[in-house]
Amino acid sequence: MLHKNDIIETEISDISHEGMGIAKVDGFVFFVENALPGEIIKMRVLKLRKRIGYGKVEEYLTTSPHRNEGLDYTYLRTGIADLGHLTYEQQLLFKQKQVADNLYKIAHISDVLVEPTLGMTIPLAYRNKAQVPVRRVDGQLETGFFRKNSHTLVSIEDYLIQEKEIDALINFTRDLLRKFDVKPYDEEQQSGLIRNLVVRRGHYTGQLMLVLVTTRPKIFRIDQMIEKLVSAFPSVVSIMQNINDRNSNVIFGKEFRTLYGSDTIEDQMLGNTYAISAQSFYQVNTEMAEKLYQKAIDFSDLNSEDIVIDAYSGIGTIGLSVAKQVKHVYGVEVVEKAVSDAKENATRNGITNSTYVADSAENAMAKWLKEGIKPTVIMVDPPRKGLTESFVYSAAQTKADKITYISCNSATMARDIKLFEELGYHLVKIQPVDLFPMTHHVECVALLVKA
């Protein structure tokens, strides 16, 4: 009979989709952080629930040849790099297998080759966006990340996967906040001023945006702080304030104020220029997002007569990337601000053959069908929850020749592909792309054709 705090010797037999080691002991399946298949460990039992348990490595008796020995385990404990203890070559194989397993288990597809994961040459310092909490640690204002499953801040200076200038701006701002004696947010007391720092950087332009998330409007001596920030970082073109006075884990409140410069930065994606606001959805790994979108374009095999529906269109990055190759792009996005951004981005890039509407994807699809718009290609890039059933049915009713599906969750994608196959489409290609090295997340693009 197992009990909490028992220490047992066991072998790790597998790895979960979230990068946890899996061990099977006395009928329990244990999940163990920082443990890899093939490793023999002494494990402390932390928690037992029915037939599921959680364990902690007390000692490694053998280690995997695929272990990344150079990783600072702070990045594991905070979740910044929950797959960082695995060598990068093995991370890419893990992600390929994850996609293949979901296709087989959920969609019952085993006859379509899942291509090797497209990876980065240098899988570090790639994120163009950072969101870091500000708290008091040992009497001093600190920035960093929360320890996993807690609100205990771990102080960090090098965030491993963020672009280095973003790290530098965060650390400089932290030091300024200390110098000007700005009080960090205290969740328990619901006191303090500064809750979070959010930084965005244009990968190609180098433009920087800093957002100060505060509990109230007034920031004492903010003009002096801004002067020092822009003097030290000439690439800062936007300093924003967001006011969030709610007792909530949501980072942004409703009110934004422009403290310096513009309320957007600019960047390029596949030759187009985009304005990016604090709230814009914009892929955090520009280099690999371009490869992902280019793969989607290649899969779609577009021509000048194609009519494309861009569902979940965001600020237009996918649809506007193909607009110059096709007859017309119809984009739909539920967030109204993103739709207005997409229209402005079309104008910014001289694109006149695109239409963007604010609506649910399934509603817009039904309206376009009634108007006699017949897409030849539907491109979708939904959130992690995937497509709604009603959208899949609406998409199938258009009888579009191709569905190009970009996914950030291969499990919900597999579920949706299963339904598309029942409605007369056939999966022909699927390509995983590593937009999030050192983490368990994987993007992929799949092509379905009308049978």
From Swiss-Prot:
Disulfide bonds: none
Keyword flag Transferase: yes
Domain TRAM: 1-59
Residues reported in the UniProt entry to bind S-adenosyl-L-methionine: Q283, Y312, E333, D381
UniProt-listed Enzyme Commission number(s): 2.1.1.-
A Pfam family this chain is assigned to: tRNA_U5-meth_tr
Molecular function GO labels: rRNA (uridine-C5-)-methyltransferase activity
Keyword terms: Methyltransferase, S-adenosyl-L-methionine, Transferase
Enzyme class, spelled out: transferase
BP GO terms, sorted: rRNA base methylation
SUPFAM superfamilies (alphabetical): Nucleic acid-binding proteins (SSF50249), S-adenosyl-L-methionine-dependent methyltransferases (SSF53335)
Active site: C408
Record-stated family: Belongs to the class I-like SAM-binding methyltransferase superfamily. RNA M5U methyltransferase family.
Name recorded for this polypeptide: Uncharacterized RNA methyltransferase SAG0633
Lineage: Bacteria, Bacillati, Bacillota, Bacilli, Lactobacillales
